[in-house]
């Protein structure tokens, strides 16, 4: 019996060891879980803080844009002294040359006198040049007071102001009432025409403001120095575009001193290749060798 009693506690000893190791494992895992929860809470709080800060920055930028648009709208607002129902309404305009900035909001150090002085520095101008405050010393000169007046049409061409932009081509008015754009043409001493009316040909002329008006005919040449319509003969031949050129083929030119007239022909770039016309090539210079003593 004594041996059985001594064997029972020996069998209970190894069963207590796993219980203690499990408790130790639980005691170690609990702080780890709590630490993970704390880190998760900190991460979520940081994300919320970033979101609120981003929203605040966006709201501040929107407010600054609204404030700038409001100040711009305020610069062009008209201030009226009398109600709009009054018959003689006096309207004052704001000068838009400089932006209107609100006076800085400070503490009680800014007195009412300083605010009044700041308000007097802002000068309101009307379109006629007079100041809003009525100061006679700062009045705009007389030549600046009048607003730009539209030029009325007059009978004489000398009094009429040219309202065409400076870079636009000059328009020539025909007897029928149509305006034809005039281009700058290259003049030649051998191409002067008589100042008679032409019936079957359209001659483009140029007129200068300094020299008297002359009639000059424009002939398209194959050289690149001539200023044409932007399409020279070489490019037309390579691109397969039929060019409209001036030639002297017809006879009988009424109203002119020339024996032959000018008429429009169409240049066919495939004529040379189809008819096997030989091209005139200049002879190459002879090659000579020279000996130099060094």
UniProtKB/Swiss-Prot annotation:
The keyword Glycoprotein does not apply. A motif (SLRRSST motif) lies at residues 184-190. Residues 1-23 are extracellular. Residues 154-175 are annotated as: Disordered. Keywords: Cell membrane, Developmental protein, Membrane, Transmembrane, Transmembrane helix. Disruption phenotype: Maternal mutant embryos lack the body axis: embryos develop normally during cleavage and blastula stages but lack the embryonic shield at the shield stage. The dorsal organizer is absent and embryos fail to form the head and other dorsoanterior tissues. Coiled coil: none annotated. Key maternal determinant of the dorsal organizer and body axis formation in vertebrates that acts by promoting stabilization of beta-catenin (ctnnb1). Localizes on the plasma membrane of the future dorsal blastomeres in early blastulas and binds to and promotes the tankyrase-mediated degradation of axin (axin1 and axin2). Axin degradation results in stabilization and nuclear translocation of beta-catenin (ctnnb1) for activating organizer-specific target gene expression. Belongs to the huluwa family. Interacts with axin1; leading to promote the tankyrase-mediated degradation of axin. Interacts with axin2; leading to promote the tankyrase-mediated degradation of axin. This is Protein huluwa. The gene is hwa.
């Amino acid at each position: 019996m004594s041996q059985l009693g001594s064997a029972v506690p020996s069998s209970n000893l190894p069963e207590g060891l796993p219980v203690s190791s499990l408790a130790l494992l639980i005691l170690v895992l609990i702080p780890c879980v709590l630490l993970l929860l704390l880190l998760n809470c900190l991460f979520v709080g940081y994300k919320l803080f970033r979101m609120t800060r981003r929203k605040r920055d966006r709201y501040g930028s929107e407010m600054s844009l609204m404030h700038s648009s409001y100040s711009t709208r305020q610069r062009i607002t008209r201030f009226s002294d009398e109600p709009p129902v009054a018959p003689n309404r006096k309207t004052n305009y704001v000068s838009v040359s400089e932006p209107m900035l609100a006076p800085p909001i400070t503490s009680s150090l800014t007195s009412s006198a300083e605010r009044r002085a700041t308000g007097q520095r802002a000068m309101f101008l009307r379109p006629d040049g007079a100041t809003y405050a009525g100061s006679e010393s700062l009045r705009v000169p007389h030549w600046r007071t009048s607003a730009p007046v539209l030029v009325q049409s007059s009978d004489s061409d000398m009094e009429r102001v040219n309202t065409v932009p400076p870079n636009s081509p000059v328009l020539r008015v025909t007897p029928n009432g149509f305006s034809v754009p005039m281009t700058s043409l290259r003049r030649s001493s051998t191409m002067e025409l008589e100042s008679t009316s032409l019936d079957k040909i359209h001659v483009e002329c140029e007129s200068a403001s300094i020299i008297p008006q002359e009639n000059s005919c424009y002939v398209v040449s194959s050289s690149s120095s001539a200023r044409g319509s932007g399409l020279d003969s070489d490019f037309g031949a390579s691109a397969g575009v039929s060019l409209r050129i001036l030639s002297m083929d017809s006879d009988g030119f009424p109203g002119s001193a020339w024996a032959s007239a000018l008429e429009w022909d169409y240049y066919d770039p495939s004529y040379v290749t189809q008819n096997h016309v030989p091209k005139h090539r200049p002879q190459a210079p002879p090659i000579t060798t020279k000996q130099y003593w060094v």
